[in-house]
Amino acid sequence: MHALNGWLKAVRADGLILVRTRVAGPWGYAVEPGDDVVFHFVAEGRAFVRRPDAETMELQAGELVMFPRGGAHEVANSARGKAVPHETFMAKRNGVVDHDPNAVTLICGHFNLDRHLALPALRALPQAVTLRVGMEAGFSPLSDTLRLLRREAENPNFGNEIVVRNLLSSLFVTSCANWADAISPAANDWFSAVRSPHIARALGRMHEAPERAWTLEELSQEAGLSRAAFARIFSASVGEPPHSYLTRWRMGIAVQLLEDTDLRLAEIAPRVGYRSEFSFSRAFKLARGVSPIQYRRAAQSRSFHGTLSRKA
């Protein structure tokens, strides 16, 4: 899973909403269609999740459902319970007795990802990822992450955006890793690619050294395959040719350098495989639709205004 680890380290959550809700009696809320990653974790009790054109899911305590590509759905106390818009639900959920033994405790949230960087995995994931999470202390990275998210959501002095961002990033990547461990080895998708001894080596090398001017010959040698076989297998499993994936990876790293550092474009360019500021800027605009300078200004504006919201 070396190649997967490199990708997971680069994926980051942004535009954060984290909600801890405790409800009893008939209840239900509807989540609007959207592109954000959405999750619901049942910490206590049970809940039902309904989707258009899909079977209703019953979640018991300790179960998590994540919608990697968003999508409309409803969460309720029963399979046919009424669901109101989420904003209405949150505004009217006062009066619930916290000590009601029949109450349901939910930890829910949504966040966005760099969808360009995350696209290979998002394409491979199902519409809904359901996981059973053991919540005993030290059970797994996923249970530890959810335990910390619950603590942050319940903290009255909440406001540490950096902590929550890191926890939500961890929630996504550990959920991906857990799901990847559970799928069939015969699956032909990005997660099978990162577990393949051939394709994973090439992916890992691209992740480690995006600045290198990789050729198809060099990548196929890393994979231990002929050029034709490597190109065919890579494209079939990853969903795009090797150099298209490499460009996607480079632009994802460039985005993080633009957001997190004050490096000049001339300094960023060689770190992501471009010989000049001009060639980097041209490639970035082609991939992202804006110039690197425009992207950095927009990112600084988002950072200044803040993104974290919480309701309890």
Q: PLM features: residue spans?
A:
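Short helix-to-turn junction characteristic of helix-turn-helix DNA-binding domains
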Residues: 42, 206-209, 257-258
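An amphipathic alpha-helical interaction segment
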Residues: 107-122, 127-204
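Generic protein-terminus/edge-of-domain signal
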Residues: 1-64, 71-99, 116, 308
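Glycine- and charge-enriched low-complexity intrinsically disordered segments
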Residues: 98-106
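Residue at a beta-strand N-cap/secondary-structure junction
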Residues: 56, 213, 262-263, 278
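Intrinsically disordered or compositionally simple regulatory linkers and C-terminal tails
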Residues: 304-311
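Hydrophobic residues on short alpha-helical segments
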Residues: 39, 150, 203, 252-255
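Basic/polar phosphate-binding segments, predominantly the helix-turn-helix DNA-binding elements
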Residues: 170, 174-180, 201-252, 269-298
